[in-house]
Amino acid sequence: METLRHATNATGFPLAREPPPTLIEIRKLSKYYRRGEQIIPVLADVNLDIELGDFVALMGPSGSGKTTLLNLIAGIDKPSSGTIKVGGVDIARLSERDLAAWRASHVGFIFQFYNLMPVLTAFENIELPLLLSNLSRRERRERVGIALSLVGLADRADHRPNELSGGQQQRVAIARALITDPTLIVADEPTGDLDRTTGEEILSLIDQLNRELGKTILIVTHDPKSAEKARRLIHLEKGVLAD
């Protein structure tokens, strides 16, 4: 756990050694899509600060812009206007190449449907983000071993996804999100495909990443029960912050 906390980021993309207290600073953020001559607004003039080490839940009805906002903060998509600064870096102004390098180094992703490679073992799925790093094979194996232990799957390293339960697959996905030691972990409906008991176990594990490793967590959920672990709730209504 300590090794993951203090390890150097794998891709080495430049970022302040000690990120500022406000990790995410969003100003006048808007996103729209064009369909022919029609403009379809998704987010409108969003202003938002998220502190380093916070655990934030984004809530709102379907179509409110939750996942779009998550994707913009994580550098998966770019805004139509406005700024998104993460750790002092205005990611909206980065080239696609630099944005990909920033994303690989500083953001861990957890998805509803796990997104594991079916032909790879749990160990290999977790190791995947490190293969383009300058870490040696021994260093990669050590880091993956720590991550597997952290999520309680040290005895499942050689199992492929079809040999694991849904909850175990999501634990592998969490370990993969953690493996590059990112500052920010984003989770889009991480319990949406799990039963209630397993979902609560996954949320407790995500909460552990926040409390014990200091990871900033941003989670999208429809479920008020799933949002209870968060320290801050942000509500979106028709692309506008409602809180």
State what each model feature region is.
Residues 1-32, 242-243:
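ABC-family P-loop ATPase nucleotide-binding domain
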Residues 21-236:
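ABC family nucleotide-binding domain
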